[in-house]
């Protein structure tokens, strides 16, 4: 009988020792552990003692564990730790966010100011392009590229302002030449600035003149070419002692 009691008591002591050894290891993740928390507020709190089994010791253990939990709760909410509680964290975040916002806004202002200054200098930069110069669009300054895409548009409808009928002026070659391209295409209303009804009348006038054969369809009118000093005229090498006011066309015939 005594031997069985000794065996049971030794087995119980081994179980308690094994429980104490396993309790020393924590299963909490190191990333979730609370760092740098002072233990002054709960250093003297009683700990749970597994070696005693009396009712008084159980009451003391329950009181100690509840005191420990309350100390931890107060410590986390008061922000006494180095990481701070919720209020201190919010305050620090607001201060830090305000500083970051101020620095970012200052950087944006400096960037915009430098961009405006560089654009002003680039707009003041002008270059004289000569005939035959080869350049790419990226070589132009903003001042030089301004207005390249959009053409010149009439401010008002010329037909309504002057009050004439385009269909009655189909023999007016100067009027027709203003509303067609050098290759005989009718200009768009975006370029002419005419209303839709007047644009249709102008188009009908141009087609009528070309259809009757009184206006060329692929080049400017001969009268306009004759009075202009364009590339179609070639200078005539005149010998000494002769008049130098003559010019000849591509056919080799004298214009005058």
Curated annotation (Swiss-Prot):
One of its GO terms (biological process) is translation. It is found in: Mitochondrion. Pfam families: Ribosomal_S18. Its main location: mitochondrion. One of its GO terms (cellular component) is mitochondrial small ribosomal subunit. Residues 21-30 have a biased composition (Polar residues). Keywords: Mitochondrion, Ribonucleoprotein, Ribosomal protein. Coiled coil: none annotated. Residues 44-66 have a biased composition (Low complexity). Residues 19-106 are annotated as: Disordered. One of its GO terms (molecular function) is structural constituent of ribosome. Component of the mitochondrial ribosome (mitoribosome), a dedicated translation machinery responsible for the synthesis of mitochondrial genome-encoded proteins, including at least some of the essential transmembrane subunits of the mitochondrial respiratory chain. The mitoribosomes are attached to the mitochondrial inner membrane and translation products are cotranslationally integrated into the membrane. Belongs to the bacterial ribosomal protein bS18 family. Component of the mitochondrial small ribosomal subunit (mt-SSU). Mature N.crassa 74S mitochondrial ribosomes consist of a small (37S) and a large (54S) subunit. The 37S small subunit contains a 16S ribosomal RNA (16S mt-rRNA) and 32 different proteins. The 54S large subunit contains a 23S rRNA (23S mt-rRNA) and 42 different proteins. PANTHER family: 30S RIBOSOMAL PROTEIN S18, SMALL RIBOSOMAL SUBUNIT PROTEIN BS18M. This is Small ribosomal subunit protein bS18m. It comes from Neurospora crassa (strain ATCC 24698 / 74-OR23-1A / CBS 708.71 / DSM 1257 / FGSC 987).
